[in-house]
Curated annotation (Swiss-Prot):
SUPFAM superfamilies: Epsilon subunit of F1F0-ATP synthase N-terminal domain. NCBIfam families: ATP_synt_epsi, PRK13442.1. HAMAP family: ATP_synth_epsil_bac. This is ATP synthase epsilon chain. The gene is atpC. F-type ATPases have 2 components, CF(1) - the catalytic core - and CF(0) - the membrane proton channel. CF(1) has five subunits: alpha(3), beta(3), gamma(1), delta(1), epsilon(1). CF(0) has three main subunits: a, b and c. It is a peripheral membrane protein. It comes from Streptomyces coelicolor (strain ATCC BAA-471 / A3(2) / M145).
Length: 124
């Protein structure tokens, strides 16, 4: 059996995903980071961006994450996000409309959020 780490992706309002994984890639204020079993302990601030989780069974889970924290120690990774949603929960047409609306209104924050949702949905 390959080495694993336990992952918990939690939004402010719910647990989004929890399980065993072999690799997690997330965007932090210091740049993109990949965490594998045995990684050195870390604590960081999450940026808006897709999170990719390679599950122990060989699958891939992708989520759109907006702000929060990442913590890793003793092969336990916690992603505590202000907002997070799995790629298969994202309504692509709605996200596209929100992106166009944000561009029209010049709302950079809303534009970034819609862009992250679309990138996560594309990574399904």
């Amino acid at each position: 059996m390959a080495a694993e780490l336990h992952v918990a992706l939690v939004a402010a309002d719910r647990e989004v995903w929890s399980g065993e994984a072999t690799l997690v890639v997330a965007r932090t204020t210091s740049g993109d980071i990949g965490v594998m079993p045995g990684h050195q302990p870390l604590l960081g601030v999450l940026e808006s961006g897709p999170v990719t989780i390679r599950t122990s069974d060989g699958g891939t889970v992708v989520a759109a994450v907006h702000g929060g924290f990442i913590s890793f120690a003793d092969n336990k990774l916690s992603l505590l996000a202000e907002v997070a949603e799995l790629s298969d929960e994202i309504d692509v047409h709605r996200a596209e409309r929100k992106l166009e609306q944000a561009k029209t209104e010049g709302d950079a924050h809303a534009e970034r959020r819609a862009d992250v949702r679309l990138r996560a949905a594309a990574g399904r």
